Amino acid sequence: MINEEPNYWPRYTIKDHHRLRHQFSQSERVRRNWSQSMQDMFVLSMLDGKRNGVYVEIGADKPKIINNSYLLERKFGWRGVSFELDESKVEFFNQHRKNKCICTDATTFDYKSLFQERNYPKQIDYLSLDIDPSEATLAALKKLPLDEYRFSVITYETEVYRAGIDGYYDEIWQKQSAEIFESHGYELVIKNVANMGNPYEDWWVDPKVVDRAIIGKFSKTDSWSRESTECIFNNTQFSIMPITAILEE
């Protein structure tokens, strides 16, 4: 049984507010981020600090630390659902979160039925896809009812970095995911988002929903990979707050 979360230094703290590429509505209320690579800050940036949004998080892992939906729920009143295969992780998650996590195999789950049961809007605000291994993430993507539901912002794990570590990664998985997103009218804002030098995610948006002026602040095509701090900040330096400040919610 999991009963604690590890300490984790956030990628964003309030001291970095002045360096945000886009100071979204109520960004001054965010003292720290919780996602591993500032996916939460990217979502809030693209949707200009939207309140009361809806998310779908496939691959939840922990309830707070390195979680993509916690900040959205905690500070901006979002509702949504998370998915995780590990039963002990789900039990721990549900002890600490208002919006619950479902224990299931994300590659076979009937998402459409759940969306209908919960009366989710046809335009869902955020989709986080992050499960292991990469082909499982792709399989989960293919199970989503993409012809009937759209997502305003998508963060999609590709694990490109694995190609240089164990040779396990197959670039076809990233290519196939891109083909799926592009065929449904999504726009790639940042490719190969990196964490500590390891490229592992692509970030997409629905250009019919996200303001073109905001997209323009983040789009960059002259580099193969970008560190997450570079994606969100106007420069790559960021502050470290005292541990007492970091633990504040």
Task: List each model region and its residues.
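Conserved acidic-Pro-Pro-aromatic motif
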Residues: Y70-L71, F76-R79, K122-L129, P133-E248
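Generic detection of long, well-ordered alpha-helical segments
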Residues: P10, R32-S37, E87, S128, ...
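Conserved amphipathic alpha-helix within the SDR
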Residues: S113-Y120
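SAM cofactor-binding core of SAM-dependent methyltransferases
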Residues: V30-K112
